[in-house]
Amino acid sequence: MNLNINTLFASFPSGLAQGLLWGIMALGLYITFRMLNFADMTVDGTFTTGGAVTVMLIIAGWQPWIAVLVAFFAGLLAGLVTGILHTKLGIPAILAGILTQFALWSVNLAIMGFSANKAISVNTYSLAISSRYVPHAILTGFITAALTVAVMYWYFGTEHGSAMRATGNNPEMSKAQGIDINTMKMVGLALSNGLV
């Protein structure tokens, strides 16, 4: 591989397209680590779960955007499991995340038909974002990231979103104000893992 300045500039557009989508994952991590003060290890498993669900649905003939939406809900469920383990069963936050992460390894293999990888090609399947069509990929990534940030900004400005932010900042005071902090933690974990 020739490493020169031209190669660097040639790889910039596809890196930008991928980086925009990775930014959504960073937003999901921000919700648990910064807003809820919850060290969530579940995201290691839900990242793979989202990919496994998306790939298997695209291979089955589903549209990529519908597959991504279903993968979002799969992540929601995984985050909810972590939330239930922590809030309802009293398992410490870090351990609840690790338990869910380990469980997701088996779940991910089952989703993919007990195969460690699945081949997916832009030649065979209609993909929403591909490095082959870089201008389209950058535009799609930018629109997706902008819409996600806008919806999250709106949500965290609502009463429910403010209650979630308050839960992370000061759980004792939030509880004194009548906020169900366990529900807020579960919703935050579900939302975070869905975005990842």
Where are these regions (language model features)?
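Transmembrane helix-bundle core of multi-pass membrane transporters
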Residues: 93, 97-157, 186-190
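Alpha-helical transmembrane segments within multi-pass membrane transporters and channels
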Residues: 62-102, 143-146
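Transmembrane alpha-helical segments of multi-pass membrane transport proteins and ion-pumping complexes
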Residues: 22-27, 76-84, 105-109, 149, ...
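Membrane-interfacial amphipathic/re-entrant helices at transmembrane-helix boundaries
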Residues: 1-25, 53, 60-66
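Interfacial loop-to-helix junctions that mark the boundaries of transmembrane helices
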Residues: 6-15, 65, 90, 128-141
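Membrane-helix/interface signature in polytopic inner-membrane proteins
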Residues: 150-190
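Membrane-interface helix caps of multi-pass small-molecule transporters
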Residues: 31, 56, 60, 77-80, ...
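Short, non-helical or kinked segments that cap or interrupt transmembrane helices
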Residues: 32-50, 85-99, 163, 187
